[in-house]
UniProtKB/Swiss-Prot annotation:
Pfam families membership: CHB_HEX (PF03173), Glyco_hydro_20 (PF00728), Glyco_hydro_20b (PF02838)
SMART domains: CHB_HEX
Superkingdom per UniProt: Bacteria
Gene Ontology biological-process entries: carbohydrate metabolic process; glycosaminoglycan metabolic process
Name recorded for this polypeptide: Beta-hexosaminidase B
Length: 773
């Protein structure tokens, strides 16, 4: 699926021409020219009866020959889907673990020269964008591990002077449909300049008075505009200054200062029976008044005031706004585990979330490729687990998955200290945002497992076997062989050993301490629990457990139920991904469960969200085909992103989403092959009166190697997410149980389509208005 960064190590082989020294290692790093070519994404036949594959070539050359760099090497590189068939006799390719592969010289290899030496190979699944090809190689020799690995210069990521975006110059151009479409049945269009010109929608509206997200009700009181250049004077009743300080700071940043001589803004909070924030904002000729039912309502009213502001002349329209959100849960998931995001990025994201009235930050802090939160007493989680570099022993860092290279100071590495995390919590609270931490388990736990194994080895060497064993996450007698969905053979906690739960209890207790220190209660914890393979078949502990537990169903369900009870005892709500929660027995779970519905709408998985909502759980919609912001904006090889759930997620697609009526999208969208599909709701209907709890966008980070790349993928889609999470549009097709939808079913009428298009034009006009924020 992705060809990632290369890391070449000069490696001892059985009969090397020359034994490499550091000079030769350095030379190869500087002079080896590597080119990657995607030959075909849809071969007529795949070797070894593989259902789906793609065909690629690597070529190696040097400008001048160096016989000392001819044979004593291996090339390590990241490719997320396994290479399974290699042609020719120049090189052999071996899958190591996860996405790490190794190239070694084979019998036909006679040395590098100015003429390219090539290897062609087949990889499982598919690859369609240049961002799925990563950079970087390193050099070392196994028989002398004291040599320093060197990144091969030709594979370094470069900055494009025209676009300012990162690019890999070692990739040959992607120019044909055979490099974009994944099979003979794939009709995905090439969304280049010609396509975009033909499908452009010219703006038909000037920037009207309005807000993102759209308020429930907005009435223009006058064509006059109120001048705030002299500042504002907030008069508060029933609310503390701290509760609105960050909204006030945003206004100040935009040029509206807080001063006693400024225009009076009366802010009154009077609680009522309604728990959701509800506010009225009135901008009159001589004053501004805000009435809300809680502090969040007043905060959002001031954010609306900032959104109405013309930043050129500091004037605002005279309006009356009555507003309340569609969903109580309006979230953004940020993955900082695969590739790290700086604290500054998180704080800035919190500011933007608050500006557009999002209120939940799901922080994905641990996965196979990194552990990003310091835990008191378990230093190895971050000293080892927060870094990827080249260390085959994994005692000082994890393997360089996702093409991480060998630099521990690279942007992809790092963690939040206790003080960093406390600062994030407090900053989020000040912006009326709740942080939901997640340390994914029992799958996606390789960083934790390897870090605790490094801890075990260190303490054993110090003669402390009891301490060493306490948090060890490996059962040495377990001989189960498996491959996870990301092709790891060692990334899943053994759910049958006591140490696993000792470790989890320790981690959860320490996370709760951090929340307590911040003055921000840990209300909800997301356990992850997704994509866990059928494992532990040869585990003695699991065989014993299975025999001893009455009504045993499955190991993943057992794990989730046990951790859920642990969280419930600590007074913490349980959240998890729907695929893992599908393994539990509802009767064995706490009553208050949050399920992130991962149902891919067009793959007939909407029933998952319906099923969990029907059993009384709080379902937060997380449909990958519309809410995953690590996917491309358009189906074009230059667009960054993954492609398994959707070939293109434009801001407009997020805007068009009708979250209360999942099957209805069969009328307006197509599947990943650009084909129409049918959604039959008759067997999986929502019960009458059942509603979803919220909507969440997702910024996964496998392909986002820098904060700049993350920003590119997040904006402006974040604003479209906020629009749908806050505002229920008039054009959305109401849900009706049991309907069957298709491109020809006709429920989404021409009138509704016209209303949607007019609403989109309003949204675009506001978004593109340089005079507002």
């Amino acid at each position: 699926m992705k060809f990632n960064r290369l890391m070449a190590l000069l490696f001892g082989v059985s009969s090397p021409l020359y034994a490499l020294d550091q000079t030769a290692v350095n030379w190869l790093g500087q002079n080896l020219d590597v080119k990657y070519t995607l030959l075909d994404t849809k071969p007529t036949t795949c070797p070894k009866a593989q259902q789906k594959c793609y065909y690629s070539e690597l070529s190696f050359s040097v400008r001048k020959e160096n016989t000392k760099a001819n044979n004593d090497f291996a090339i390590f590189f990241s490719q997320l889907m396994p290479i399974y068939h290699v042609e020719g006799d120049n090189f052999a390719i071996t899958h190591i673990n996860g996405d790490i592969h190794k190239i070694t010289p084979a019998a036909g290899f006679s040395g590098f020269s100015s003429a390219p030496t090539t290897v062609r190979f087949y990889t499982k699944d598919s690859q369609v964008t240049r961002s799925e090809v990563y950079a970087k190689l390193c050099c070392e020799r196994t028989r002398s591990l004291k040599l320093t690995p060197q990144v091969i210069k030709s594979t370094q990521t470069q900055r494009d002077n025209d676009t300012g975006l990162d690019c890999n110059l070692n990739l040959t151009p992607f120019v044909t449909l055979n490099q974009l479409q994944t099979s003979s049945k794939d009709d995905t269009p090439w969304m280049g300049s010609e396509y975009l010109y033909q499908h452009q929608v010219k703006p038909t509206l000037d920037a009207a008075i309005g807000l993102i997200p759209k308020p429930k009700q907005l009435t223009v009181l006058s064509d006059k505009r109120l001048n705030l250049a002299a500042g504002i004077n907030l008069q508060l009743s029933g609310i503390s200054a701290d509760a609105i300080a960050m909204a006030q700071q945003r206004l100040n940043t935009l040029g509206v200062k807080s001063t006693k001589e400024g225009l009076v803004v009366n802010v009154a909070v009077k609680p009522n029976k309604q728990s959701s924030p509800h506010y009225q904002l009135t901008v009159a000729e001589n004053n501004i008044s805000i009435q809300g039912n809680n502090s969040a309502a007043a905060f959002y009213a001031l954010q609306s005031l900032a959104g109405l502001l013309d930043i050129n002349d500091l004037r605002i329209p005279m309006v009356d706004i009555i507003d309340t959100p569609r969903y109580d849960f309006r979230g953004l998931h940020v993955d900082v585990a695969r590739n790290f995001r700086s604290k500054a990025f998180i704080l800035q994201t919190i500011e933007q979330m608050a500006a557009y009235k999002l209120n939940k930050l799901h922080l994905h802090l641990a996965d196979d490729e990194g552990w990003r939160l310091a835990i008191d007493g378990l230093d190895e989680l971050t000293s080892v687990g927060a870094y990827r570099c080249f260390d085959l022993t994994e005692t000082r860092c994890l393997l360089p998955q996702l093409g991480a290279g060998n630099d521990k100071n690279a942007q992809v590495n790092g963690f939040y200290s206790a003080e960093d995390y406390i600062e994030i919590l407090r900053y989020a609270k000040a912006h009326h945002i709740e942080v939901l931490p997640s340390l994914d388990m029992p799958g996606h736990s390789r960083a934790a497992i390897i870090a605790m194994e490094a801890r075990y080895k260190k303490l054993m060497a110090q003669g402390k076997p009891e301490d060493a064993q306490k948090y060890r996450l490996v059962e040495t007698a377990d001989k189960t062989r498996y491959s996870s969905i990301q092709h790891y053979n060692d990334n899943t906690l053994n759910v049958c050993i006591a140490n696993t739960y000792t470790f989890i209890d320790k981690v959860l207790s320490e996370v709760k301490v951090l929340h307590d220190r911040a003055g921000v209660p840990l209300n909800t914890y997301h356990i992850g629990a997704d994509e866990t393979a059928v494992l532990w078949l040869e585990s003695p502990a699991c065989k014993k457990l299975q025999a001893s537990v009455k009504d045993f169903t499955n190991f993943n369900g057992y794990f989730i139920e046990r951790v859920a009870k642990l969280l419930d005892k600590k007074g913490i709500q349980v959240a998890g991904w729907s695929d893992g929660l599908g393994d539990v027995r509802a009767a064995n779970m706490p009553a208050n469960i949050q399920s992130n519905g991962l149902g891919d709408i067009k793959r007939k998985r909407a029933p998952v969200a319906h099923r969990f909502a029907n059993q009384g759980w709080q379902v937060v919609l997380s449909s990958p085909d519309v809410t995953y912001f690590d996917f491309p904006y358009q189906s074009h090889p230059e667009e960054r992103g993954n492609h398994w759930a959707s070939r293109a997620i434009e801001s407009k697609k997020m805007f068009e989403f009708m979250p209360d009526n999942l099957p209805a999208h069969a009328e307006i969208w197509k599947n990943t092959n650009n084909h129409a599909y049918i959604a039959n709701d008759s067997d999986s209907s929502l019960n009458k009166g059942v509603q979803f709890a919220g909507l969440q966008g997702h910024l996964w980070s496998e392909m986002l190697r820098s904060d700049a790349q993350a920003e590119y993928m997040l904006y402006p889609r974040l604003l479209a997410l906020a629009e749908r999470a806050w505002h229920h549009a008039e054009w959305e097709l109401p849900y009706q149980a049991g309907r069957i939808y298709s491109q020809s079913s006709g429920y989404f009428t021409a009138k509704l389509q016209a209303q949607r298009e007019a609403d989109w034009q309003r949204f675009v006009a506001i978004l593109g208005n340089s005079r507002t924020t």
